[in-house]
């Protein structure tokens, strides 16, 4: 199934994705699915079904988070990315039935986006890597 009324904005930190989603949803009286909009579902997730997304929720000792090997961390990021996409698509299935334009700040992988959306409904925004790295922790979020 391809979404006809959903527009995806993907990319790096500081590229302007959140700003673009807000502005487009205001201009077109649409729905803004802002960064991490799927977080509203996390508190009710089963840790067996969503081990990546519930890892930090259920973490007893943050030292365990920091002590992971680079390979373990990478595997967690990859798992969490897949799980986020599942939740986002569940939310978008419901929202898309409202008939409004939906603008999504997302990290859904591009191979998934190519299956669920037309090319002209996907925008990839990239910030200068130096800005993304040097200013990342200046963000309020």
Residue ranges and their predicted role:
Residues 9:
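Hydrophobic anchor at the beta1->P-loop junction of P-loop NTPases
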Residues 1-4:
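Phosphate-binding P-loop
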Residues 12-15:
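ATP-binding Walker
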Residues 18:
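Walker A/P-loop
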Residues 28-46:
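Short beta-strand-centered segment that lines the nucleotide-binding/catalytic pocket of NTP-utilizing
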Residues 41-101, 108:
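ATP-dependent small-molecule kinase phosphotransfer cores
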């Amino acid at each position: 199934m391809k979404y006809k009324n959903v527009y995806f904005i993907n990319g790096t930190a500081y590229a302007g994705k959140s700003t673009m989603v807000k502005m487009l949803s205001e201009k077109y009286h649409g729905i803004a699915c802002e960064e991490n909009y799927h977080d509203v579902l996390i508190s009710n997730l089963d840790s067996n079904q969503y081990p990546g997304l519930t890892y930090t929720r259920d973490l007893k000792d943050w030292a365990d988070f920091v002590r992971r090997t680079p390979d373990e961390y990478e595997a967690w990021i990859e798992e969490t990315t897949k799980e986020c996409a599942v939740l986002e698509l569940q939310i978008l299935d419901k929202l898309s039935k409202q008939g409004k334009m939906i603008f999504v700040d997302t990290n859904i992988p591009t191979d998934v986006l190519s299956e669920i959306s037309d090319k002209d409904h996907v925008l990839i925004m990239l910030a200068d890597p130096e800005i993304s790295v040097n200013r990342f922790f200046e963000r309020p979020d």
